[in-house]
Regions:
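Sec-dependent bacterial lipoprotein signal peptides
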Residues: 1-16
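Generic detector of short alpha-helix boundary/capping microenvironments
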Residues: 2, 42-43, 147
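N-terminal targeting sequences that direct proteins away from the cytosol to non-cytosolic compartments
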Residues: 14-81, 92-105, 109-110, 115-122, ...
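A short gly/proline-enriched turn/hairpin at secondary-structure junctions
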Residues: 87-89
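Short, Gly/Ser/Thr-enriched beta-strand-loop segments that form substrate-interacting elements
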Residues: 131-145
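A short, hydrophobic, proline-anchored segment that marks a local hinge/packing element in signaling
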Residues: 146-152
């Protein structure tokens, strides 16, 4: 005869399986191989190295108006759903220079609502007359990386990295790290003509 304790153990062990939800997963990202090529736009006073896997798109509208310069363009990386929006301005005087710098800071600070931290990284390359600031924006901001570069007398270039997706810092972190290297390469290789 089977002991009653053993039978009660068997009945207790046969309870229904309680499913546990699987952790949320994100699609696998295939990163392109890091290759850079020279970029020089006719009529623009600068050159730099752009990713070889990017598509350079001339910007055609600015808030439903014509763009202010032929040197406004986007560096699009379709495989990562990312764009670096670049705007070039000629400096016509000290007041204009101050206005452009203030605008760059204002544009970066607009992300303070969602940002948890904004790091300002100074850029000084005196040999190439390139100076500026890179804004590394942490948190769920729409643009996580922005910059401006200038020679402080004639040329001013502003750029901002955007992803065509909802800002999710944790899931975007690897792609953001990949794209930051491309922005840094642009900043490191920019030369005024």
């Amino acid at each position: 005869m089977i002991p009653i304790g053993f039978l009660s153990f068997l009945f207790a062990a046969c309870e229904d399986y309680v499913p546990v939800p699987k952790p949320r997963a994100f699609p696998r990202v295939i990163y392109p191989e890091k290759v850079y090529q020279p970029f020089k736009q006719t009529g623009c006073n600068f050159s730099f190295e752009a990713p070889g896997y990017a598509v350079i798109e001339r910007d055609s509208t600015f808030f439903e108006e014509q763009v202010r310069s032929d040197c406004w363009f986007n560096i699009a990386v379709p495989s990562l759903n990312a764009k670096i929006h670049c705007s070039y301005y000629p400096i016509t005087g000290r007041a204009r220079f101050d206005e452009l710098v203030q605008d760059a800071f204002t544009m970066a600070q607009k992300h303070n609502i969602k940002a948890s931290f904004i790091e300002e990284i100074p850029i000084h390359r005196p040999a190439d007359h390139v100076h500026g600031i890179v804004f590394a924006i942490e948190g769920a901001a729409a643009s996580s990386y922005q910059f401006f570069l200038t020679d402080s007398t004639e040329n001013f270039l502003r750029g901002a990295l955007y992803f065509n997706t909802q800002a999710r810092p944790d899931s975007l972190a690897p792609v953001l790290a990949f794209m930051r290297k491309d922005v840094n390469r642009l900043v490191e290789t920019l030369k005024w003509e």
